[in-house]
């Protein structure tokens, strides 16, 4: 195998396997390595590519040295010592999004942010379908991007994580946005500013930047070539909220579009998502009627502030996707404002090095009891114990039972962990499913 053209894929999950399939289809020489002894796709890989070198249980410096280019899976940090050493030597290190960007010519809508990106990506994709466009919704959502190149759609709507953006250099989008920023993945970034810089890469070579007017610190110093299109709940923006006939309505540049009461989801963070989706859709020239019709009918996504059931006049919400402090803060604030009573919060898991103190004010205002689970429950207790009643649970089943005992008619039980799930569950979906099943069994 010639090292002059050798590509080394680091990481053999879904993304790594999709990269292997893409390179194999192009007859590009490649090898694969993963530090795990049994990475998720290794059995599929060796059946399909029995003659391709696969190193498991370690990273091989010798193989990395031989590579002309390295494709890094998003789960592997650029700070991994052997990877950082290759980068310092000037080796090209890319991700699957970069490989995708080099090989597509169709318009791309690109979306990132700490919270709401899956919802906004989904909504924009549905808006395009409602307008009769053939669209592929992919990236950090659904199937890997490299599996969506053939057959090629009319449009791509991409959800992108900071990890994916770090290794992307050729993305040229019709419109792109950073929805918001709050602490997340601080186990991978030294500072919040480093995390923001990774996110800001989404605006490189973007034709129409879409910006959050409520968080100007994200974008105000960036050298945009074109005037941004903005959305915002609190500040003057192209897409905003306005009072009309004693009703709060969505407005575009001062023109009333529809009252928020017509939306099935009209809590504060849902409205921000709707405004962002409208701005992105406008940049993609989707007719406003199609977008408004879609928003009226949209009832949300599983595990994202999803209403589960009412039991003894207590409402139960599954926000298992609330894997960081910002997401949980937004969920507490939105549901707290709408609740007749108070909130009982189920939180905890792997905190990823986050600072939990931004939860203090909303917990003090809306939460009468917190049920803590998981690895970083002691850190959450240390932050919140002076503010509200703290209880602990060893399982989701116990957490739901304790929450139900603490709740009264009109209260809300909210699972929004502010943490990753891997200490107790397979992933956040598994955590949300266990919560939902437990609630439905009450």
Swiss-Prot record:
One of its GO terms (cellular component) is cytoplasm. GO terms for molecular function: ATP binding; UDP-N-acetylmuramoylalanine-D-glutamate ligase activity. GO terms for biological process: cell division; cell wall organization; peptidoglycan biosynthetic process; regulation of cell shape. The keyword Cytoplasm applies. It catalyses: UDP-N-acetyl-alpha-D-muramoyl-L-alanine + D-glutamate + ATP = UDP-N-acetyl-alpha-D-muramoyl-L-alanyl-D-glutamate + ADP + phosphate + H(+). Pathway: Cell wall biogenesis; peptidoglycan biosynthesis. The keyword Ligase applies. ATP binds at residues 113-119. It comes from the Bacteria. It is found in: Cytoplasm. It is an enzyme of class 6 (ligase). Belongs to the MurCDEF family. This is UDP-N-acetylmuramoylalanine--D-glutamate ligase. It comes from Coxiella burnetii (strain CbuK_Q154) (Coxiella burnetii (strain Q154)).
């Amino acid at each position: 195998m010639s090292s002059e053209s050798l590509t080394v894929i680091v990481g053999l999950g879904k993304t790594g396997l999709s990269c292997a399939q893409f390179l194999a289809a192009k007859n590009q020489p490649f090898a694969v390595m993963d530090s795990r002894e049994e990475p998720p796709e290794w059995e599929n890989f060796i059946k399909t590519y029995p003659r391709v070198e696969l190193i498991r249980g370690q990273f091989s410096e010798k193989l990395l040295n031989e590579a002309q280019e390295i494709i890094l899976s998003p789960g592997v940090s650029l700070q991994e010592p052997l990877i950082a050493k290759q980068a310092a030597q000037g080796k090209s290190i890319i991700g699957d999004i970069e490989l995708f960007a080099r090989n597509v010519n169709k318009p791309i809508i690109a979306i990132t942010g700490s919270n709401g990106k899956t919802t906004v990506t989904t909504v924009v994709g549905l808006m395009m379908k409602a307008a009769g466009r053939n669209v592929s919704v992919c990236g950090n959502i659904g199937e890997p991007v490299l599996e969506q190149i053939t057959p090629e759609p009319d449009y791509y709507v991409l959800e992108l994580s900071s990890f994916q953006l770090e290794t992307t250099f050729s993305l040229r989008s019709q419109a792109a946005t950073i929805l918001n920023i709050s602490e997340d993945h601080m186990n991978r970034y030294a500072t919040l500013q480093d995390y923001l810089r990774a996110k800001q890469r989404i605006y490189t070579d973007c034709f129409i930047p879409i910006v959050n007017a409520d968080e100007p610190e994200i974008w105000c110093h960036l050298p945009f070539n074109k005037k941004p299109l903005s959305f915002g709940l609190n500040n003057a923006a192209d897409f905003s909220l306005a009072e009309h006939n004693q009703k709060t309505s969505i407005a575009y540049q001062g023109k009333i579009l529809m009252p928020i009461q017509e939306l099935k989801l009209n809590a504060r963070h849902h409205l921000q998502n709707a405004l962002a989706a409208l701005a992105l859709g406008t940049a993609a020239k989707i007719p406003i009627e199609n977008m408004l019709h879609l928003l009226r009918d949209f009832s949300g996504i599983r595990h994202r502030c999803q209403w589960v059931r009412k039991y003894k006049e207590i409402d139960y919400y599954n926000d298992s996707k609330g894997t960081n402090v910002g997401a949980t803060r937004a969920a507490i604030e939105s549901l707290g404002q709408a609740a007749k009573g108070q909130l009982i919060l189920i939180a905890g898991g792997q905190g990823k090095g986050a600072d939990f103190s931004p939860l203090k004010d909303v917990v003090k205002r809306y939460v009468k009891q917190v049920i803590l689970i998981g690895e970083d429950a002691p850190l959450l207790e240390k932050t919140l114990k002076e503010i509200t009643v703290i209880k602990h649970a060893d399982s989701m089943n116990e957490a739901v039972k304790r929450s139900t005992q603490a709740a009264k008619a009109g209260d809300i039980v909210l699972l929004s962990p502010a943490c990753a799930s891997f200490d107790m569950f397979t992933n956040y979906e598994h955590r949300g499913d266990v919560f939902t099943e437990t609630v439905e069994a009450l």
